[in-house]
């Protein structure tokens, strides 16, 4: 009878021992997704003078486990300034959206930069995690090209004899943030006025490629003056003389192709 009692106690004590199922063990994990709303899929930043210089990545971090996690957020962007939350605490099976803001400098050279967002579990229910759990997303930050130009006449005015050929020189500056091609010539009104008066006009180069912020390129307008007309006014020396305005124009081809308008500048001689 005593032996039976001992056996019963042993069997009973075995049945009440706690058994921890394998799937209840604490194994931290984190999921991270990021995207850009820009059409290219990259985080695009406009850097033309007056732009806000900001690009944004939209991210979602989630805790796939049945316990609370504290998650640190780290961001690198190839030297660009970023703003983002330092850490996020998520309850069981919870998720949270956040933004990563990237700021560029005005007039920065067109380029692509690497953006890396990393989410790392640093606490599990208030305690250090037993393993390293992190999720990382890599994206591209695209510093967008913008157009800019300046033109100037080398000679503000010229006095020419009749039936004389003259090179009229202008300087074209590329003030955009990448190499650009510029079409050069005379405005339509100026060309019509000069041709109607009998000028012959030729342009050796109608397109010029210039590196960003490089030395100015030289553009030439070759004029051959007409014969003197008896209809022209007579000056103080008793000679027929008439003043014409030559209106030079340069246009960024990148702007016409990509910016929705043609960025042009004019200069006069």
Per-region residue spans from a language model:
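Secretory targeting signatures
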Residues: 1-25, 59, 170
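Long beta-sheet-rich domains in secretory-pathway and surface-associated proteins
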Residues: 22-269
């Amino acid at each position: 009878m005593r032996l039976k009692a001992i056996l019963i106690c042993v069997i009973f004590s075995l049945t009440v021992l706690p058994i921890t199922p394998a799937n209840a063990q604490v194994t931290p994990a984190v999921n991270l997704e990021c995207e850009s709303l820009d059409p290219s899929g990259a985080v695009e930043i406009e850097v033309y003078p007056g732009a806000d210089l900001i690009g944004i990545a939209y991210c979602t971090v989630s805790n796939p486990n049945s316990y609370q996690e504290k998650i640190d957020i780290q961001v690198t962007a190839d030297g660009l300034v970023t703003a983002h939350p330092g850490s996020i605490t998520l309850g069981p099976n919870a998720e949270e959206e956040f933004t990563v803001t990237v700021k560029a400098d005005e007039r920065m050279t067109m380029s692509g930069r690497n953006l890396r967002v990393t989410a790392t579990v640093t606490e599990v229910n208030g305690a250090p995690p037993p393993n390293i759990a992190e999720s990382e997303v890599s994206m591209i930050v695209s510093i967008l090209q913008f157009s800019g130009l300046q033109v100037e006449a080398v000679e503000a005015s010229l006095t020419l004899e009749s039936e004389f050929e003259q090179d009229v020189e202008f300087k074209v500056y590329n003030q955009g943030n990448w190499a650009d091609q510029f079409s050069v010539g005379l405005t339509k009104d100026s060309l019509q006025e000069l041709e109607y008066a009998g000028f012959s006009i030729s342009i050796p180069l109608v397109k010029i490629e210039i590196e960003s912020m490089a030395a100015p390129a030289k553009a030439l307008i070759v004029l051959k003056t007409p014969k003197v007309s008896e209809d022209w006014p007579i000056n103080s020396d008793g000679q027929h003389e008439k003043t014409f305005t030559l209106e030079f124009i340069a246009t960024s081809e990148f702007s016409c192709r990509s910016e929705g308008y043609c960025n042009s500048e004019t200069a006069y001689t």
